[in-house]
Amino acid sequence: MHVALYARVSTTRQADNDLSIPDQLRQLREWAAANGHLVIQEYVEPGASATDDKRPVFQQMISDAMMKPAAFEVIVIHSLSRFFRDGIEFGVYERKLAKNKVKVVSIT
């Protein structure tokens, strides 16, 4: 399966608490390899809050996922909070992506 990885931190405090972008990417890559997936793209967003969708890298990833055909089949994230803090907003994007047969998978 073709997958995209999305890693994000909002603060340097998070980076110091074992949620650094390199740590997230390492875990995401290991998960993808262990599950036989091919990583097509890595999206990295340092210093961006997940309280809204005004994140340039996030928007590029969504745009790539909505291409016909989609650039990848799955967006892999470390935890749901890396994608969105708000469950309603998460659901909106999850449904939007599902219409183009793209899933969001959290490894934790």
Segments the model singles out, each with a brief description of its role:
Residues 1-108:
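Short, structured surface patches at the beginning of a domain
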